[in-house]
Regions:
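Short amphipathic alpha-helical "recognition" segments used for binding
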Residues: 17-20, 40-42
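Short beta-strand-centered aromatic/proline hotspots
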Residues: 10-17
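Intrinsically disordered, low-complexity, charged/polar segments
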Residues: 27-48
């Protein structure tokens, strides 16, 4: 699933949602993990 950050408008791919954490992949291929609360607050589903 693709999502967009509300603040910087960049698109990320959701790789995994597990144990209150969300793993995202940036357009450059790098991967990072955030807590699910931050994800819910700052990311929206990308309808493009």
């Amino acid at each position: 699933m693709l999502v967009r950050n509300k603040w910087n408008k960049k698109t990320y791919e959701v790789l995994e949602i597990e144990n209150g954490k969300v793993t995202l992949k940036r357009e450059d291929g790098s991967i990072f993990t955030i807590v699910q609360k931050e994800y819910i607050t700052n990311y929206i589903k990308n309808n493009a």
